[in-house]
Swiss-Prot record:
<dbReference type="Pfam" id="PF20857">
    <property type="entry name" value="Pgp3_helical"/>
</dbReference>
<dbReference type="InterPro" id="IPR008444">
    <property type="entry name" value="Chlamydia_pGP3"/>
</dbReference>
<dbReference type="Pfam" id="PF20858">
    <property type="entry name" value="Pgp3_N"/>
</dbReference>
<dbReference type="InterPro" id="IPR049000">
    <property type="entry name" value="PGP3-D_N"/>
</dbReference>
<dbReference type="Pfam" id="PF05475">
    <property type="entry name" value="Chlam_vir"/>
</dbReference>
<dbReference type="InterPro" id="IPR033758">
    <property type="entry name" value="pGP3_C"/>
</dbReference>
<keyword id="KW-0614">Plasmid</keyword>
<protein>
    <recommendedName>
        <fullName>Virulence plasmid protein pGP3-D</fullName>
    </recommendedName>
</protein>
Length: 264
């Protein structure tokens, strides 16, 4: 065993040896290793520290060895804060998201006026248009009233859906009423009629309506405008046909497809 033997320490007999092998250990202990008992034979083990734990091992030939295990306060503090922060943040965001989702679901299922967006189309009408056609009591339910100012083809994405139609038209005439009519191709009369007014200056005349889609094939609509019983109407122009403020003006027609809600 090399440098080994017995010696008397105070009143006790001691055995000493270097490079000793214990049990079935196959290698001598190395720096900072200890002998660790197991359920079978002893093994060589090394103590290590994990997050938040400090480990100090003192061992030399001239002094008693020591192993000091303590708490690394700064690392432990930061570790705890990080863990608590993650849990608090996850809890708050999870609660907010779940609450928001539930509010939306409740709104959709309880509000019969709310629909789901499917498709959106927007058409611009630019340039000046003179509308000489009139709307009268005899032609308002036919396809002869007013003057056509635009045709719009839209394709539904779902059968049984509806289009919310919004037409905002800049119209001028010598003081009097303005009539707007939306016509669906194939119909024998307008599917929606609206009224506006101009006192000789440009005014925004609007038509708001909804139309039901019976299928998912492209459908064409036309918008007709004319004076109420009398008068010439100008679109995107002054009542005398001149440009408004010397610039080109634009009117808009939009179609928004929705699916009506059915509460049961």
């Amino acid at each position: 065993m090399g440098n080994s033997g017995f010696y008397l320490h105070n009143t006790s007999n001691c055995v000493f040896a270097d490079n000793i092998k214990v049990g079935q250990m196959t290698e001598p202990l190395t720096d900072q290793q200890i002998i660790l008992g197991t359920s079978t034979t002893p093994v060589a083990a090394k103590i290590t520290a994990s997050e938040g734990i400090s480990l100090t091992i003192t061992n030399n030939a001239q002094a008693n060895s020591s192993v000091n295990i303590g708490l690394d306060a700064e690392k432990a503090y930061q570790l705890i804060l990080d863990k608590l922060g993650d849990q608090i943040f996850d809890g708050i965001t999870g609660s907010i998201v779940e609450s928001a989702v539930q509010d939306i679901i409740d709104k959709i299922t309880s509000d019969p006026s709310l629909g789901l967006l499917k498709a959106f189309y927007n058409f611009q009408i630019t340039g000046k248009i003179q509308c000489n056609g009139l709307f009268t009591s005899s032609n308002v339910t036919t396809l002869l009233g007013g003057t056509e100012i635009g045709r719009f083809t839209v394709t539904p994405r779902s059968s049984g859906s509806m289009f919310l139609v919004s037409a905002d038209i800049i119209a001028s005439r010598m003081e009097g009423g303005v009539v707007l009519a939306l016509v669906k191709e194939g119909d024998t009369q307008p599917c929606a009629i609206s009224y506006g007014y101009s006192s000789g200056v440009p005014n925004l005349c609007s038509l708001k309506t909804c139309v039901t889609n019976s299928g998912s094939t492209p459908t064409t609509y036309s918008l007709r405008i004319g004076g109420l019983e009398s008068g010439v109407v100008w679109v995107n122009a002054l009542s005398n046909g001149n440009d408004i403020l010397g610039i080109t003006n634009t009117s808009n027609v939009s179609f928004l497809e929705v699916i009506p809600q059915k509460n049961t």
